[in-house]
Amino acid sequence: FKYTTPGSILDKTRELVIETFEKSASEIKDGMDVSLLCIDIQNKKVSWSGANNPLWYIQDNKLIEIKANKQPIGKTDLVQPFTTHDIEYKEDTTFFLFTDGLADQFGGPKGKKFKYKQFQELLISINDKTMQEQSLLIDKEFENWRKDLEQVDDVCVIGIKI
């Protein structure tokens, strides 16, 4: 297709998903949230675009959030082109792509949602660990929070340290 920016890739993906849904005998009102990151290691730059899912990155021990376009890949009332964000990064920057499953998980002492603020605080607190250690600590925190409650959604967290 010759699309090179995350925003244009998400635009084309949305077009293809809608086209596919329209071929169905029944009306499909579904979509997906996506976060797409392209890494240019030589120029220390990333390009990112998101459909409902933000990008978080930790640089100099500060968590920075880049907000996503508030629209899914799929049919939506107001279709706008997806924005591509270009970010220059320093060595030892960690990027996080994730679904809403961890933040939406019920648990803890009061059976409440984990929430994004708590998720951010967790990521900052474990930032000095290796990515493998971070993975284990996130999983442990999730299980300790959830305890015996049912998992409510898929949980996917991708961390990339550059």
Each language-model region and where it sits:
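Conserved subregion of the PPM/PP2C metallophosphatase catalytic domain
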Residues: 1-162
